[in-house]
Structure formats: structure tokens, C-alpha cells
UniProtKB/Swiss-Prot annotation:
Entry keywords, A to Z: Oxidoreductase, Pyridoxal phosphate
Broadest EC class assigned to this enzyme: oxidoreductase
The protein's name: Glycine dehydrogenase (decarboxylating)
An example Gene Ontology molecular-function term: pyridoxal phosphate binding
Recorded GO CC terms: cytosol; glycine cleavage complex
């Protein structure tokens, strides 16, 4: 309910408690325009109500008849109520000390990083840094990440993160397939690789015809493989010398991928120094909580010859318009939004926020601090090994960094029983072996407890830690010949910010350079940059969610699994499908999973030959990239002059490929920002030819509560929880990409059999390293839905559509709106056509994007889905005041363009061509331009009270790609 204005309450009979309870208060905070503003915008559009507008925008044939069936979450909860309800679920989890290892370790997040990065909206509400001039802070943090990874792995170049270690290993496999031994389709995986990694590799390999072989690492050179994956150290703790093996693999024409533990590499010889071609791994133990599996930033580092084949983001150094160093995303032509089915990967969002945390962990500790942590971890492992041997147990591995595998024989069950009594988790290697992985958080008291567990099982007394320590004095605990001797993290950034004062100021200096949602709206079309409310973010840092190992026993994760089940049902209600899996940890992975599910469905019906995927020409680049990865052949369907799917062309191609048609991938509303009237017909055509309908859920923010893909003909969709359901973009990740399916596809949802998570017997293999993907950020979406309730979720969708149409209407006299539906209306976004301006003035869409920075705005999406256009999506969270500020900026820019068109301003020397303008340029002694300094920096009066200064001038992208440099910049370059 809405509260009446306090002034109107003063002279009335006291209201009841029910009338005063503010369950809807959060919705009023989340939805930007108040009732008066909404009515004013509706008046501008010529509609009496929001309902009338929605009736005109959305085809009646697909309108949802019923209210969102959210069950117990239909009524909104207040922020306090939602937090209390989620706290009750969190309290059902049991936080044990987990020494399971297997790629996940407990860690200490330095408080200065927790408060000033993870909990700071300046970092977590930013977008992927496609606009480099207003992204220099996070680009520098990601460049630090790349430098950290390259240094620790001993390889030439690293990317700016991948989704998790398992998918990074799978990406390495396909990288080597593209570049490696031409006559082999074999990828060899050593038998001590993490089991979840092997499962994801098998999932990825099957549809593209790669044969995965496994066996002892020693046999790899004889496998005739184009690539070999080694684990360093191995899952059971062994640290092996792979130098001779690597030489033999190279001699046989293969390449070597090493999955390496970065903390171990501070004390072990790095893979790059013994011949590895690619290194992959996880940076989770660099200050990022386990979080029941994620999100965490994986990495990939490669030899120089592979740099142009790497997947994911790559930050590079270039110069700006004044010749000063500037950072930007390099080699973007590798990526799916440009190369589509020929891209190096379908990865779009990665794990930027977590990569930034990991890089700052290295900055804070520095090389000496990291090595001290590593040596302490290794020392504890050595003392544990000595202690269990004294108790009569044998260790399977004699070499180790942090992990021991113990032969426990008939006493295995007792060991686990005694460990459970002390709230300790150990790895269940087999019926006769137990694994123990210690970490940064392991103390001498923890070590004493571990030893006591084994002592109880042995019927003896645990040796004292101090006595063990004294007995091992002078004894090297690392394997002989593999101690690291090379320097790392020598750049000044890793050797300066070690006091909290310095670290705090460094983080502040970086965040001040960037433009995120905490400063202004980010009207990126197809990106849904909406409010990420603080109350939604709070539970992410609760230890009951953060300190849970993804492979912890089920009885310890009851609350997590209840929350996940509830969220899945919420998404079922929103989409109209029958079932949802939250395992995919990005939209790209949900999309890929959906296509594998379609293939599994066809195969189950004896139609595994169906491999043609129809994709409209307007589709997002991930669609064809994912289809290619899923082993499908992409056939493009034309769009008509209004931007809709060309029905005649669709019918012709569906008929042509009828016997082999697997699916069509459509986006709804379309990527042109319109509710296509004939979407049901599209679905019926494909179904008539035996295909399945994949509805890309990127634009779900225009559908929640009003229509549903599962009700108008969709068979499968992925969603973007980092768009519609309020998980923040984090500067380029994390994201969550659930896959939602109809009842006939539910049994094919992804499993993770290697770790005991089998959802259904017929499910596809794992698409992420952890059973529930990025589980620790799922509470964000749970909180959002719980606080909004059914009615307000629908109101949010309606307001997003209202805001988009208001912008389109106000800007149409200045910039043509390229596509619209009946009545000239759009969905939740609109495309502004700047191509005529280019013809009349020479001003490009890039010039307008850069000029918006001077006005304090991040540009809308550039040149997608149509080159030379801007796609604007305001979301429901922006107030009319902010919308009007953006509209005023766009109109002012149009007047600046008109001055060029009319000859009042020079075609080259004008504010657009030289944008953005830095404070250094505006305040310099020399001002060489015909326009004034005031016009450059303060083109509208509102900037006088709230001015954002871009830290660099326009970045030279071509220079950066010609002179590729992806490491930290020497201080001298900034002089």
C-alpha cells in the first residue's frame, strides 16, 4: 500500500496499524518516478494511465491473464522483513571449517577491500568498461590483475578474468584446438585434474567433436593429443616436476595447459618457466569467499603467440588525445559481439568485480606478504603430515604445497565422524582415503584439532604442534628442485600500498575516476542498468553464505538449498516455464546450456541429427557464438524494414532445413526494442518443422508480470539475473544466467555428477564448476523479488516501458527513433538513429558518446544492433528528473551538431570531435579551440553543482591494438 502524505494525515482520525504498515516501501524506493511524475510522463505520451500504455505496447495475444503466481512471495516484504526471512534461511546453514580443497579454500578478505570494493557501489554498480575514458579506475585494477597473473604464472600475457577454473580449462582446450595439432581431435586430461574441471571439459568437448582421454600424466606424450591438461599441484596434493614431460609433449606436436594454484606459484617454479603454453586457474583464495561455489575470478595466461586467440576481456595500454597513457579493452575483434559465430568464445560478462578483489589482495599484501602466507600454509601442511605419520597413518603424496591425501583404511569413517564432531569437513577421496587441504585461515589451534581427529581415529594422543614445529626446524617442506627463484610482482603498485591508509586512498583514487550508477544513470540498451539496492547486497557478505564450501555435505547447506529452491520457483513464475537451473554462472553459459538441452531432447527422440539453428540477423553476438559452441550450424533469418523477423524468410528457411531444424533463437522483445506482433506465429512455424524455440531472456525486464516466454511458445530461455533481477554488473561481472525450460525439457537440466549433484538421470553435463554456479549472489535476486512482490514487480516492468517511451517521445524531434511498434511505441528501450547526422555534419556516434561524458553520462549502447545508432534503456529505477537531465543533454548535443551542420562551428574544431574534455585540458594555459572552455566543460547549467571530470582524453583504440601492451604502466609514463 502507498502511505498518504504526512501533511494529509495530521487532521484525520488515527489510521489503523494495517494502514500504516509499509510493506510496499521498498517498491517506492526501487521505482524512480513517483505517481505525479508518472502521470506527467503519461500526459506527454497521451495516455491516461500506465495500464492504457501497456495495452497499447504489448500485443493482446500474449498478455498474461493472471497475476504473477509467486505463492508465499506474492505480497511484498519490507526490507527488515525480507532480511529477517533470509537470515532465518542463512541460520539453517552450518559453517564448518572446510579442508576439502578441490579448488576452493577459505580465505581472509582484508577489511579495507571488503568495505571499499565489494560493498562499494562505485565498484559494483559500474558497467563493463567499453567506454574507457570513464572507466580508468577499474581498467587499472583489471590491468593489475593481468600483471599479477602473468607474473605468478611466468607467462607473457593474461586476460582480465574468466568465469571459473573449469570453464577456463575448457576455453583453453578450444583455444588449442584452433591453433594446435591439425590432425588430432584428442584432448588429454591428467587423472589428477579437479573432477569438476574434467566434467565441464567433457560437456564442452562432446558437441564439437573433441575426444577427451584421461590417464596418468606420464602417458600424455603418447596420446597423440593436440593439447594436454595438467594440474599443478594435483587434486590429491602431489607437486610433480613436469619439465621433461612438457618437452616430450611439444616434441610430439602437442601443447600444454596447466591448471595452477596462484598461491602455490609464489613458492613453486611457475608453469611458464618449464614450458607450459597456457595456464588457467582460480583466484578465489586471494581474498574472495568460497560462497558455496562462486562467484570467483578465473584466469587464463598464455604464451605471446596465443594472445590474439584468448577468450574474454583483455585490458591494454594506449594513449589519449593528448598523448598521455590511457587504458582500454584491447583486441575486441576477438569477441562475440563483433565476430559472432567466429568469436574465440561466447563469454560476454566475466568476473570483473572478483578479479578486482583478487588483484587488490595482491596489491595489499605485496610479493613478500603473499609469499609469507604461502610459506605459512605450506608449513602447516608439513606439520600436519609429520603429525599424522607419528600417529601411524601413511600419506599418499610425499610432495605437497597445502594438500595431503591420507591412507586411512578401515578407519576412514571414524576420521570423518570425529571431524564432524569438531565441525570440520575433510575431502572424501575414497572409502580408504581422506584429503586435507589447509589454507590461509588455518591456525595452530585448527592444526591441533585436525591432529586430534586423526589421533582419536588411531586411538592415540595427538602430538603437540610446538613439538612438531621444533622437530622440523630447518627441514624444507617444498619439493626439491621446484622452489621458485624468479621475482614476481615487482611493479611499484604491488610494493607501495601496504598500509591501510595507502590502500584506502588508492582504492578511492581509482573509484573517483569512474562513472557508475552511484553518480548517474547508465542508459545502456540491452543491459538493464537498474538500481542494486543496498539491502539486497547486505546478505552477500554474511559468513553463513560466504564461508560454505561448494562440496560441503548436504546437511550443512539446508538454508542455501531452500533459498535456491525458492528462487527457482520465483523464476518459474516469472517466465511461465516448468523448471529452472541456477547452475550457469553467466548469461552466455545459460544460453549454451539451453542449446545443449535442446540437442539432448532431440537425441532422446532419435533425432540427434537436428543441428540447424535459425538466428535473426539482429541477434546479440552471443547467440551465434553459443550455437557454434553447441555444435550447431547457424542459418541467418532476415529482418524486415521494421526490424521484425521476416516471416516469409523464416518460413522458407524452416521449410528448407525442416529435417535438420534444431531450434530458432529469438530475443523478446526484439533487440530492436519492439514487441513483435507475430511472435506466436514465429514459434508455431518452428514447432511445425520439429524445432524448439529458444527465447533469449536478455530483455526480460520488459516482460515480468505482463507476458511470459513459456506462455507464448518458448521452450527454453536463459535469464540474466544481473539485469532483470538486480544482481549488479560489477564492472563486467559477476552475473548469473539461469536456464528455464518447459516441462518436456526439465529432465535435461544440467547435472554435476562428479561431485554427487545429479538433478536428473538424463541431465546434460555440468556447465559450471560448482553445482549451483555463483550461489553467494543469489540472495540479491531473492531479496529483490521478496521485497517487491507480484504487484510491484509488474509495476516495475510497466514503469520501465513508460520511461523508455517518454525518452523516445521527447527525443524523436531531435533524433529519429529507428524502430517502433503500433502507435510509434517502443518496449523498454529505443534506438536513436544518428546515421543522418553523420551524413550532414561528419559527427559520428562515437563523437556523441564521448561528448555525453562531458555532460556526466555514460553513453547508451553504441552501434548495436544497428551501426551508427544509440540504443537507450533507462530502466524503472530512474526518476523523471534524471530522465529529463539526460534528455536535456541529448538535445544540447543535437544543437551543437546543428551548429556544425549550419557552418557556425567547424567540422573538426568543435566540442564533439574533441570530447571528452579533461580538467587538465580545460585549465591549461593554452586553449587552441574556437569554442569556449565553458562550452567544453559546462555546456549546461546543472553541471555547475555536480561535475564529473573524465580522467583521460579520448583513447586511441587503433594505437593500442597496433602496439599491444597489457601490463602495468611504469610510473615514468605518467610524468
Amino acid at each position: 500500500m502507498k502511505l498518504e502524505h504526512p501533511d494529509r494525515l495530521m487532521n484525520r482520525t488515527p489510521l489503523s496499524l494495517a494502514a500504516l504498515e509499509t510493506h510496499d516501501a521498498f517498491a517506492e524506493r526501487h521505482i524512480g518516478p513517483d505517481a505525479a511524475s508518472q502521470q506527467a510522463m503519461l500526459d506527454t505520451l497521451g495516455f491516461a494511465s500506465r495500464a492504457a500504455l501497456i495495452d497499447a505496447v504489448i500485443p493482446a495475444s500474449i498478455r498474461r491473464a493472471e497475476t504473477l503466481p509467486l505463492g508465499p512471495f506474492a505480497q511484498p516484504k519490507s526490507e527488515a522483513e525480507a532480511l529477517a526471512a533470509l537470515r532465518a534461511l542463512a541460520d539453517k546453514n552450518q559453517v564448518f571449517r572446510s579442508y576439502i580443497g578441490q579448488g576452493y579454500h577459505d580465505t581472509h578478505t582484508p577489511a579495507v577491500i571488503l568495505r571499499n570494493v565489494l560493498e562499494n557501489p562505485a565498484w559494483y554498480t559500474a558497467y563493463t568498461p567499453y567506454q574507457p575514458e570513464i572507466s580508468q579506475g577499474r581498467l587499472e585494477a583489471l590491468l593489475n590483475f593481468q600483471q599479477m597473473v602473468a607474473d605468478l604464472t611466468g607467462l607473457a600475457i593474461s586476460n582480465a578474468s574468466l568465469l571459473d577454473e573449469a570453464t577456463a580449462a575448457a576455453e583453453a582446450m578450444t583455444l588449442l584446438q584452433r591453433t594446435g595439432k591439425p590432425k588430432s581431435n584428442v584432448f588429454y586430461v591428467a587423472d589428477d585434474v579437479l573432477p569438476q574441471t574434467l566434467e565441464v571439459i567433457r560437456t564442452r568437448a562432446l558437441p564439437i567433436g573433441i575426444e577427451v582421454k584421461t590417464g596418468p600424466a606420464a602417458d600424455a606424450a603418447q596420446a597423440n593429443a593436440f593439447g594436454v591438461l595438467l594440474q599443478y599441484p594435483g587434486v590429491n596434493g602431489d607437486v610433480r616436476d613436469y619439465r621433461a614431460l612438457t618437452e616430450a609433449i611439444h616434441a610430439a606436436g602437442g601443447h600444454v595447459v596447466v591448471a595452477a594454484d596462484l598461491l602455490a606459484l609464489t613458492v613453486l617454479t611457475p608453469p611458464g618457466e618449464w614450458g607450459a603454453d597456457v595456464a588457467v586457474g582460480n583466484t578465489q583464495r586471494f581474498g574472495v569467499p568460497m560462497g558455496f561455489g562462486g562467484p570467483h575470478a578465473a584466469y587464463m595466461a598464455v604464451r605471446d603467440e596465443f594472445k590474439r586467440q584468448m577468450p574474454g576481456r583483455l585490458v591494454g595500454v594506449t594513449v589519449d588525445a593528448q598523448g598521455k597513457p590511457a587504458l582500454r579493452l584491447a583486441l575486441q575483434t576477438r569477441e562475440q559481439h563483433i565476430r559472432r559465430e567466429k568469436a574465440t568464445s561466447n563469454v560476454c560478462t566475466a568476473q570483473a568485480l572478483l578479479a578486482i578483489m583478487a588483484s587488490m589482495y595482491a596489491v595489499y599484501h605485496g610479493p613478500h606478504g603473499l609469499k609469507t602466507i604461502a610459506l605459512r600454509v605450506n608449513r602447516i601442511a608439513a606439520l600436519f603430515a609429520a603429525g599424522v605419520k607419528q600417529l601411524g597413518f601413511a600419506t599418499v603424496n610425499d610432495t605437497f604445497f597445502d594438500t595431503l591425501t591420507i591412507d586411512t583404511g578401515a578407519r576412514t569413517a571414524q576420521v570423518h565422524e570425529f571431524a564432524k564432531a569438531k565441525r570440520i569437513n575433510l575431502r572424501r577421496v575414497s572409502a580408504t582415503q581422506v584429503g586435507v587441504s589447509v589454507d590461509e585461515t588455518t591456525t595452530r589451534d585448527d592444526l591441533a584439532d585436525l591432529l586430534d581427529v586423526f589421533a582419536q581415529a588411531a586411538g592415540g594422543t595427538a602430538p603437540a604442534v610446538d613439538a612438531l614445529d621444533a622437530g622440523l626446524a630447518g627441514v624444507a617442506a617444498l619439493p626439491a628442485g621446484l622452489e621458485r627463484t624468479s621475482a614476481y610482482l615487482t611493479h611499484h603498485v604491488f610494493n607501495r600500498h601496504h598500509s591501510e591508509t595507502e590502500m584506502l586512498r588508492y582504492l578511492r583514487s581509482l573509484s573517483d575516476k569512474d562513472l557508475a550508477l552511484d553518480r548517474s544513470m547508465i542508459p545502456l540498451g540491452s543491459c538493464t542498468m537498474k538500481l542494486n539496492a543496498t539491502s539486497e547486497m547486505l546478505p552477500v557478505t554474511w559468513p553463513e553464505f560466504g564461508r560454505i564450501h561448494p562440496f560441503a555435505p548436504a546437511e550443512q547447506t539446508v538454508g542455501y538449498r531452500e533459498m535456491i529452491d525458492q528462487l527457482e520457483q520465483m523464476l518459474v513464475a516469472a517466465t511461465g516455464y516448468a523448471a529452472v537451473s541456477l547452475q550457469p554462472n553467466a548469461g552466455s553459459q545459460g544460453e549454451y546450456a539451453g542449446l545443449l538441452i535442446i540437442h539432448a531432447y532431440h537425441a532422446s527422440r532419435g533425432e540427434g541429427h537436428r543441428d540447424v539453428c535459425l538466428i535473426p540477423a539482429s541477434a546479440h553476438g552471443t547467440n551465434p557464438a553459443s550455437a557454434h559452441m553447441a555444435g550447431m550450424k547457424v542459418v541467418v533469418v532476415a529482418c524486415d524494414a521494421q526490424g521484425n523477423v521476416d516471416i516469409a524468410d523464416l518460413k522458407a528457411k524452416a521449410e528448407q532445413h525442416s529435417k535438420d531444424l534444431a531450434a530458432i533463437m529469438i530475443t523478446y522483445p526484439s533487440t530492436h526494442g519492439v514487441f513483435e506482433q507475430n511472435v506466436r506465429e514465429i514459434c508455431e512455424i518452428v514447432h511445425a518443422h520439429g524445432g524448439q524455440v529458444y527465447v533469449d531472456g536478455a530483455n526480460m525486464n520488459a516482460m515480468v508480470g505482463l507476458t511470459a516466454p513459456g506462455q507464448f511458445g518458448g521452450d527454453v530461455s536463459h535469464l540474466n539475473l544481473h539485469k532483470t533481477f538486480c544482481i549488479p554488473h560489477g564492472g563486467g561481472g559477476p552475473g548469473v544466467g539461469p536456464v528455464a525450460v518447459g516441462a518436456h525439457l526439465a529432465k535435461f537440466l544440467p547435472n554435476q555428477r562428479s561431485t554427487g549433484y545429479a538433478r536428473t538421470e538424463d541431465g546434460i553435463g555440468a556447465v559450471s564448476a560448482a553445482p549451483y554456479g555463483s550461489a553467494s549472489i543469489l540472495p540479491i535476486s531473492w531479496m529483490y523479488i521478496a521485497m517487491m512482490g507480484a504487484k510491484n514487480l509488474t509495476a516495475a516492468t510497466e514503469t520501465a516501458i513508460l520511461n523508455a517511451n517518454y525518452i523516445a517521445k521527447r527525443l524523436a524531434p531531435h533524433y529519429p527513433v529507428l524502430y517502433s511498434g503500433p502507435g510509434g511505441l517502443v518496449a523498454h528501450e529505443c534506438i536513436l538513429d544518428l546515421r543522418p547526422i553523420k551524413e550532414t555534419s561528419g559527427i559520428s556516434v562515437d563523437d556523441v558518446a564521448k561528448r555525453l561524458m562531458d555532460y556526466g553520462f555514460h553513453a547508451p549502447t553504441m552501434s548495436f544492433p544497428v551501426p551508427g545508432t544509440l540504443m537507450v534503456e533507462p530502466t524503472e529505477s530512474e526518476s523523471q528528473e534524471e530522465l529529463d537531465r539526460f534528455i536535456a543533454a541529448m538535445i544540447a548535443i543535437r544543437e551543437e551538431i546543428r551548429a556544425v551542420e549550419e557552418g557556425r562551428a567547424d567540422r573538426e574544431d568543435n566540442p564533439l570531435r574533441h570530447a571528452p574534455h579533461t580538467a587538465a585540458v580545460v585549465t591549461a594555459n593554452e586553449w587552441p579551440h574556437a569554442y569556449s572552455r565553458e562550452q567544453a566543460a559546462y555546456p549546461v547549467a546543472s553541471l555547475g553543482t555536480n561535475k564529473y571530470w573524465p580522467p583521460v582524453g579520448r583513447a586511441d583504440n587503433a594505437y593500442g591494438d597496433r602496439n599491444l601492451f597489457c601490463s602495468c604502466v611504469p610510473m615514468s609514463d605518467y610524468a
